[in-house]
């Protein structure tokens, strides 16, 4: 940027159409967050009515993660072929319909299936909204675009907590899910009133349709095998999270089978850049493993271990959700200032100072607990607002929505595993200790994976001929692409 451009406030670099695009996507993400966290708020009520064990109840949270990988792939491919806008609208309709079905669910299996539908819609909303906004904003503001957008999910969680405190004590838990149908009205408005993303229009204007991940996997020469593997993965995930398997060895084998299938899909769809894709899935997996035990089981911890009433639970969750929302915005500024990866690492390191105190002080002082949660979530969860920007930078425009959607949502299976891990550990320890120990230890893994830029590093080790040296979204260099003692111009720079 020129000196004159740098002196202009960042928000003046955006025109009205870009702000409208952001506002529409942000509201969609808010509604996504609202619908998704409802189950966590009423988990104890659902558990009591359906007579579920703690692990079974936690699996209702996990169900939405089980289907996310397929939703991210299919709806992401829709976004790559037909535009980000259509994928956004379809995603909102899916997660709204699933939420309504939860309100009518007569038992565990029906609600589990409804949660699968929510997961597919949520995955599509994540990939399509993130790529839509990032590709609509100027390159030097795309960390802000990512962070500001993802804050909508946390705001949706805050709104859901407040609605929970007003609705559930009077009308019961089912009424909360009936409210979740409202986003469909918003989806119809979106279809008519928002423009298409600029990057997508430039890439596809007047050109033949691109070959998407769905084309590669389900219309290519290996389509029969891939369909069989898709069904196998779905079945394995079902048994892992809803089949009530008691044998840990069987669960481990099924988990390894799913991992092999997802890696196969990544290798087929990304070619020589498969090491980058696989490592991105690992990064996201651990990002969910460190953050989602708290996200999913914090309401249960507040109601059971601390014996808070619904009103107090809602107030504490307000601090938590608002902290995450503020953190997403702060992360956007940090990412544009320090760089995406450096901002991520610094924020996570700071969050580690707070995670133990959050669960050590007990529930005697609600305000102190709320403030600690605010800052811990601001630093630890909020920085995930720039994760779409981080992932999207490794993919070209014509495969970004599906690449981001599939990679992120396969890794998001960590979010399916996280609450069950927390519940299992809580059978031997108290729930607060289980949540703190999981989050504290796994955060360090994410710090190493992102700080060392392991996607680029592993790509350089295994398939250096396909190494990308610069971020495809903002053009900044990847630190892991540069070997120690070598000049950057000795590396192969792939076409962005």
Curated annotation (Swiss-Prot):
It catalyses: N-acetylneuraminate(in) + H(+)(in) = N-acetylneuraminate(out) + H(+)(out). GO terms for cellular component: plasma membrane. It comes from the Bacteria. InterPro entries: MFS, MFS_dom, MFS_trans_sf, SA_transporter. Pfam families: MFS_1. It is a multi-pass membrane protein. The chain crosses the membrane at residues 22-42, 58-78, 92-112, 116-136, 148-168, 170-190, 224-244, 247-267, 278-298, 313-333, 353-375, 406-426, 431-451. Keywords: Cell inner membrane, Cell membrane, Membrane, Sugar transport, Transmembrane, Transmembrane helix, Transport. One of its GO terms (molecular function) is sialic acid:proton symporter activity. SUPFAM superfamilies: MFS general substrate transporter (SSF103473). It is found in: Cell inner membrane. Belongs to the major facilitator superfamily. Sialate:H(+) symporter (SHS) (TC 2.A.1.12) family. Catalyzes the proton-dependent transport of sialic acid. This is Sialic acid transporter NanT. The gene is nanT.
């Amino acid at each position: 940027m020129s000196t004159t451009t740098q002196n202009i406030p960042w928000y003046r670099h955006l025109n009205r159409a870009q702000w409208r695009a952001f506002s529409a996507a942000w509201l969609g993400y808010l509604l996504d967050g609202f619908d998704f966290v409802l189950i966590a708020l009423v988990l104890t009520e659902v558990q009591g009515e359906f007579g579920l064990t703690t692990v079974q109840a936690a699996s209702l949270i996990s169900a939405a993660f089980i289907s996310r990988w397929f939703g991210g792939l299919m709806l992401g491919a829709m976004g790559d072929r037909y535009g980000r806008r259509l994928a956004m609208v379809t995603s909102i309709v899916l997660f709204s319909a699933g939420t309504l079905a939860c309100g009518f669910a007569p038992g565990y299996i029906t609600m589990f299936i409804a949660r699968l539908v929510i997961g597919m819609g949520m995955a599509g909303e994540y990939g399509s909204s993130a790529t839509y906004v990032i590709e609509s904003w100027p390159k030097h503001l795309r960390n802000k675009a990512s962070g500001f957008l993802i804050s909508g999910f946390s705001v949706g969680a805050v709104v859901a907590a407040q609605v929970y405190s007003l609705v559930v004590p009077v009308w019961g838990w089912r009424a909360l899910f009936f409210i979740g149908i409202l986003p469909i009205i918003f989806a119809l408005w979106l279809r008519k009133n928002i423009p298409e993303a600029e990057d997508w229009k430039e890439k596809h204007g007047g050109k033949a349709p691109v070959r998407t991940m769905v084309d590669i996997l389900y219309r290519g020469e290996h389509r029969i095998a891939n369909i069989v593997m898709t069904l196998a993965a779905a079945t394995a995930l079902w048994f892992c999270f809803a089949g009530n398997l008691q044998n840990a060895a069987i669960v481990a084998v099924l988990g390894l089978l799913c991992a092999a299938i997802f890696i196969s899909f990544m290798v087929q769809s990304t070619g020589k850049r498969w090491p980058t894709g696989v490592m991105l899935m690992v990064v996201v997996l651990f990002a969910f493993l460190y953050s989602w035990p708290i996200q999913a089981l914090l309401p249960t911890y507040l109601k059971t271990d601390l014996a808070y009433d619904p009103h107090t639970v809602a107030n504490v969750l307000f601090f938590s959700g608002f902290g995450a929302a503020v953190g997403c915005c702060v992360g956007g500024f940090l990412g544009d200032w320090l760089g995406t990866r450096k901002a991520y690492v610094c924020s996570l390191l700071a969050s580690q100072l707070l995670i133990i105190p959050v669960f050590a002080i007990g529930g005697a002082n609600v305000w102190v607990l709320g403030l600690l949660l605010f800052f811990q979530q601001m630093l630890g969860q909020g920085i995930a607002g720039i994760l779409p920007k981080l992932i999207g930078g490794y993919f070209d425009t014509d495969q970004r929505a599906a690449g981001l959607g599939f990679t992120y949502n396969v890794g998001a299976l960590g979010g399916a595993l996280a609450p069950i891990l927390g519940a299992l550990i809580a059978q031997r320890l108290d729930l607060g200790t289980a949540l703190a120990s999981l989050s504290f230890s796994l955060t360090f893994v994410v710090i190493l994976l992102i700080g060392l830029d392991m996607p680029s590093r592993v790509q350089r080790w295994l398939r250096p001929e396909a190494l990308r040296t610069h971020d495809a979204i903002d053009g900044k260099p990847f630190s892991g692409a540069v070997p120690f003692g070598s000049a950057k111009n000795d590396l192969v720079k792939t076409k962005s």
